[in-house]
Amino acid sequence: MKKLSLILSSILISFFTTQLFAEEKFINGQASVIDGDTIKIQGISIRLSGIDAPEMKQLCFKNDVAFNCGLSAKMHLEKLIKKDKGKANCKFENLDKYGRILGNCVGLNVAMVADGWAVAYTRYSDEYLHWQKIAKKQKLGLWSTKFDYPEEWRRKYK
């Protein structure tokens, strides 16, 4: 029974995401934050494309004091969404290699990098590199700390 339920769920998810990409390019509504680069709208998880935020258990160091910068990045994304009354508007771009929906969410992707709480994910896109350079120069967010790039941290600790 569990196997049948899993198969049916997979088929429905596959159909639903195919329909989203075929018919709709945007999804908007009340958003909840999963982590520093993932939100959920209408039950759909959307990975913010072109950026990479610290992992939820990732530590960074400010003045030699460790803090959970993954949690800080998540809280910053929550703050950005609250400015828009808890809503987000995202354009679907693609699926990543794990099957997650990648989206460019109006004002969110760029703000996370510009405010220094995510890095430009240059492995996939240089779109946010300009904003990263500015944040780094101004020592905003992560750039005021000692940190591993999230991709490096995942290689070391996951």
Name the predicted role of every residue range.
Residues 5-6, 10-11, 16-158:
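Small beta-barrel nucleic-acid-binding modules, primarily SNase/OB-fold domains
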